[in-house]
Amino acid sequence: MTLTLLPAVDVADGLAVRLVQGEAGTETSYGDPREAALAWQRDGAEWIHLVDLDAAFGRGSNRDLIAEVVRSVDVAVELSGGIRDDDSLDAALATGAARVNIGTAALEDPEWVRKAIDRVGDRIAVGLDVRGTTLAARGWTREGGELYEVLARLDADGCARYVLTDVRRDGTLTGPNVELLRAVTAATTRPVVASGGVSSLEDLRVIATVPGVEGAIVGKALYAGAFTLPEALAVAAEVPAAGAP
């Protein structure tokens, strides 16, 4: 199998945006999120990583618009942002998203997350958003525990996969934290999706060689024109992913 690429569509105040290091106030707007998602579909994406930033930051939500984005495309969607209880989880699943990412709740409400994993299974991934080895919560504004302790607990709870983001690299075009990727994939048998810092096609080639990594989320590099999605998909196709089944 090849490395799965997930172009990102982050939504804030009804617009597709990108942040630098996940910080509110650093947004660059890229217009209608539906158009952004459809553009990635036209370019060959098989997955889209869709994030409700307002819900993640606890400052509102774009729930109806997010559902419209999911309905507007014919590809699989991984949905993230503000999924912290049964209501928000059920609403996220009801959009038709193939998979949902739980972040803050995995750190603040582990019992609920365990029950959610029992109920929904592999439609749940847990987002591990990291500074150093400390997890970040609440839209990356608070500390949320030690990475490897949380990872061991989630493995025991049956989590199917993880989305690993180095917050310090996200939106910076400075390259992925490959050392962190290798450390996390060595600590779990579950597949990992890499996120944060991808800036070049060579970065994707390197990520694909890390055992345990099945995919990569790509955001700013695409929006900034560092490479095109068809170019990235061609690279992914030529380098078999070490972590793909």
Curated annotation (Swiss-Prot):
Record EC number: 5.3.1.16
Catalytic activity: 1-(5-phospho-beta-D-ribosyl)-5-[(5-phospho-beta-D-ribosylamino)methylideneamino]imidazole-4-carboxamide = 5-[(5-phospho-1-deoxy-D-ribulos-1-ylimino)methylamino]-1-(5-phospho-beta-D-ribosyl)imidazole-4-carboxamide
Any single GO BP term: L-tryptophan biosynthetic process
UniProt keyword Cytoplasm, yes or no: yes
Keyword annotations: Amino-acid biosynthesis, Cytoplasm, Histidine biosynthesis, Isomerase
SUPFAM superfamilies per the UniProt record, alphabetical: Ribulose-phoshate binding barrel
Pathway assigned in UniProt: Amino-acid biosynthesis; L-histidine biosynthesis; L-histidine from 5-phospho-alpha-D-ribose 1-diphosphate: step 4/9
Major localization listed first in the record, in broad terms: cytoplasm
Active site: 10, 129
Gene Ontology molecular functions: 1-(5-phosphoribosyl)-5-[(5-phosphoribosylamino)methylideneamino]imidazole-4-carboxamide isomerase activity; phosphoribosylanthranilate isomerase activity
One Pfam family hit: His_biosynth
Location in the cell: Cytoplasm
Any one Gene Ontology cellular component term annotated for this protein: cytoplasm
Family: Belongs to the HisA/HisF family.
PANTHER family per UniProt: 1-(5-PHOSPHORIBOSYL)-5-[(5-PHOSPHORIBOSYLAMINO)METHYLIDENEAMINO] IMIDAZOLE-4-CARBOXAMIDE ISOMERASE
Protein name (record): 1-(5-phosphoribosyl)-5-[(5-phosphoribosylamino)methylideneamino] imidazole-4-carboxamide isomerase
Annotated source species: Parafrankia sp. (strain EAN1pec)
